[in-house]
A protein has these predicted regions:
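Short, compact, well-ordered microdomains
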Residues: 72-118
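N-terminal domain-onset segments
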Residues: 1-69
Length: 119
C-alpha cells in the first residue's frame, strides 16, 4: 500500500525509507540533486559524487540519515528512488509537503491506482 503523508512535520529520510520498505531490504537507491541544501544550511551540494548514481543501500544509508521538515513550505529532502525486491519507492511532494510512496516493481493485477502529490 502507498504511504500517506506523514503527520509529524519532522521526518528522517532513512527512517522513512525503511518504514515504506517494511520487511523488505532496500537493494539500491538513486539520490537526486537539490537547488538548496537547507537541511545543511548551504547552497553547495556536499555529496556531488553520489547524485544521480545507482548506490547500494550500504553506500547510501548514512547519506540519507538526516532529519528534515516534511511539512508545507519548501522541499528539504533529497528526491529519491529506491528499489526493494517487489517495490519501487519514490519521493512525493505537494506544496512543499514531502513524503514517500511506493508502487509495485513489476506489473501487478488487482491493485488500485491513486493520485500522488495532491490534487
Amino acid at each position: 500500500m502507498p504511504t500517506e503523508a506523514m503527520e509529524n512535520t519532522v521526518a528522517n529520510l532513512k527512517e522513512s525509507l525503511l518504514a515504506v520498505a517494511g520487511e523488505e531490504p532496500i537493494l539500491e537507491i538513486v539520490i537526486g540533486d537539490k537547488e538548496k541544501w537547507r537541511f545543511l544550511n548551504t547552497d553547495e551540494n556536499p555529496w556531488p559524487e553520489y547524485i544521480s548514481k545507482l548506490l547500494s543501500w550500504e553506500e547510501a544509508k548514512e547519506i540519507v540519515d538526516y532529519d528534515f521538515d516534511s511539512g508545507f513550505g519548501g522541499t528539504e529532502s533529497h528526491p529519491i528512488m529506491a528499489w526493494t525486491q517487489t517495490r519501487v519507492i519514490f519521493s512525493v511532494c505537494y506544496d512543499g509537503s514531502e513524503w514517500l510512496a511506493s508502487a509495485p516493481r513489476n506489473p501487478t493485477d488487482g491493485i488500485t491506482p491513486q493520485h500522488y502529490g495532491g490534487g
